[in-house]
Amino acid sequence: MMKVALLSSLIALSSIAYADEFKLISTDIAAGKPLSIKQVFNGFGCTGDNVSPQLAWHGAPKGTQSFAITAYDPDAPSGSGWWHWTVVNIPADVSSLATGASSSPAGLPVGAIQGRNDYGNSGFGGACPPAGDKPHHYQFTVWALKVDHLSVDANASGALIGYMLRANALAKVQIVAPTRR
């Protein structure tokens, strides 16, 4: 009888822990699946739609005061990866961004700021791995932060924002989409 009670308690606790797990989902991208033409850059020899993906998250840790989003290619032949998108100062009560949110200020929550991607623009810059290269592992990450505001502007580089995110992160969750051309 004691074993049954213990087992029941463990099952109940595991489902509570599962319910509180920080998760990221998307209708546009999937873990382990290549990005679609919608998330491919239009330039640098690529001919995609350059549309930021829909992202939704839940289960952020207690104490989360804001969120940030990054899209990063650690496999880019730059010596330091490639920042495709950074969004900071997303209020803690926001839990999703729609497809194409980066395309206009109205697509982002009030107060959110998009930093400069490595194409030199503020906003989303889609995937564009070199032709014939190995798959690049595009990391779409939502960061739960212990601060409500990062003091950056739209000219902030991905490297600066990445540094500030790591210094202020409570947790992060990501979808990795290996993509080649």
What residue spans do the PLM features occupy?
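Bacterial N-terminal signal peptides that target proteins for export
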Residues: M1-L6
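N-terminus-centered regions that define maturation/targeting leaders and the start
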Residues: Y18-R181
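Hydrophobic h-region of N-terminal signal peptides that target proteins for export
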Residues: L10-Y18
